[in-house]
């Protein structure tokens, strides 16, 4: 839809009168310049909720600064905590994918849902000014609390583990099949430790880990000692001789919270996610041909009372005509004129 045209502006105004929420991510002030700001749209619809998601918010000195997902992660603080501590001079790195945009979208959604709940008992809508920079700055895990409260320290990057204000034991262990496991809390309880040492001893690789001092460490959950570092290195050598899945399954059997470092696509082959939990689902795409479907990531939760269903996203302009006909009572002739004049597209 051409929202710069008078006809497009009128369509937006008409739709805003009958909708619950308006989402937008234009530059600050752009919709107001077209007469489509919240003040105008809510004039005859005080229950309307409108959420604007921008890089730095609608006001302040950064209001008109440009940004990208990478900038959001850099200025928000996430990149400062991501990287390596075993490569001298290594720079911070960004997480894979558009995490900055996802974080911003989640916060925008949470604010919108909160406004909907408030409207349920107040009858009032409101305008939500969401900032990607502020969303990312609010999602730095331990970094901000560690700096704001005693001992008021900055976190530093640690390879394959949480950034922290003090060094923690290296958790990445390589396996014989060139995979990695996250291994930690080896002294979490005595029974698990004894069972782990017995398993290692079956393969002749327990060395002296059956000594009483290590049992005492497990019983007392002792960590951060030279003996603990030594035990971890013995375990690391043992893990290097075993396949990743074997160590993972056995560690879970022994009640250790370890896990395999998987690529996203490896989860597609795990029946726990694909078959038992239904995490992945096939969605039909009839617009591409008969019996054409693709596998998508599903929902990360199961509604027991209202089972979910999934379908493909609408095509661009796929529902434009239907909405104008049914919701705004436009005639077919009027819609055809809007199409021919380039105000809207239909699919």
Predicted features and spans:
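A structured beta-alpha segment of the ubiquitous adenosine-cofactor-binding alpha/beta core
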Residues: 1-43, 240
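Redox-cofactor-proximal catalytic regions of oxidoreductases
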Residues: 1-14, 72-81, 292-308, 313
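Non-transmembrane alpha-helical segments in soluble domains
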Residues: 13-16, 113, 193-197, 236, ...
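Active-site-adjacent "lid/gating" segments in soluble enzymes
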Residues: 18, 32-187, 191-198
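Flexible, small-/acidic-enriched active-site or ligand-binding loops
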Residues: 93, 289-337
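Aromatic-enriched alpha-helical interface/lid elements that frame and gate functional surfaces
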Residues: 169-254, 258
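A glycine-rich dinucleotide-binding beta-alpha-beta segment and adjacent secondary-structure elements
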Residues: 253-307
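Amphipathic terminal alpha-helices
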Residues: 333-347
């Amino acid at each position: 839809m051409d929202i710069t045209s008078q006809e497009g502006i009128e369509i937006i105004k008409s739709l805003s009168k009958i909708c619950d929420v308006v989402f937008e991510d234009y530059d600050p002030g752009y919709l107001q310049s077209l007469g489509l700001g919240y003040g105008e749209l809510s004039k005859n619809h005080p229950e309307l909720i409108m959420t604007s998601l921008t890089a730095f918010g609608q006001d302040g000195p950064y209001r008109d600064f440009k940004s990208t997902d990478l900038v959001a992660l850099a200025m928000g603080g996430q990149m400062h905590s991501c990287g390596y501590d075993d490569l001298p001079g290594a720079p911070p790195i960004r997480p894979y994918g558009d995490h900055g945009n996802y974080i911003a979208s989640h916060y925008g959604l949470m604010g919108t849902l909160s406004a909907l709940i408030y409207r349920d008992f107040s009858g009032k809508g409101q305008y939500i000014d969401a900032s990607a920079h502020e969303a990312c700055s609010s999602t730095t895990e331990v970094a901000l609390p560690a700096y704001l409260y005693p001992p008021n320290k900055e976190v530093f990057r640690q390879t394959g583990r949480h950034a922290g204000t003090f060094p923690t034991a290296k958790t990445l262990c390589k396996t014989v099949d060139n995979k990695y496991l996250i291994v930690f809390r080896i002294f979490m309880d005595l029974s698990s430790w004894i069972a782990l040492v017995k398993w290692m001893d079956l393969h002749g690789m327990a060395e002296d880990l059956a000594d009483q001092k290590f049992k005492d460490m497990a019983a007392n959950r002792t960590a951060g000692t030279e003996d603990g570092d030594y035990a971890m290195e013995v375990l690391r050598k043992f893990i290097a001789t075993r396949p990743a899945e074997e160590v993972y399954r056995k560690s879970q059997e022994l009640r250790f919270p370890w896990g395999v470092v998987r690529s996203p696509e490896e989860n597609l082959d795990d029946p726990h996610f694909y078959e038992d939990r239904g995490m992945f689902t096939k969605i039909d795409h009839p617009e591409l041909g008969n019996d054409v479907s693709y596998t998508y990531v599903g929902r990360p939760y199961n509604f027991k009372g209202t089972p979910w269903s999934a379908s493909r996203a609408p095509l661009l302009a796929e529902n434009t005509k239907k909405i104008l006909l049914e919701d705004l009572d436009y005639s077919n002739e009027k819609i055809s004129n809007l199409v021919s004049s380039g105000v809207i597209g239909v699919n």
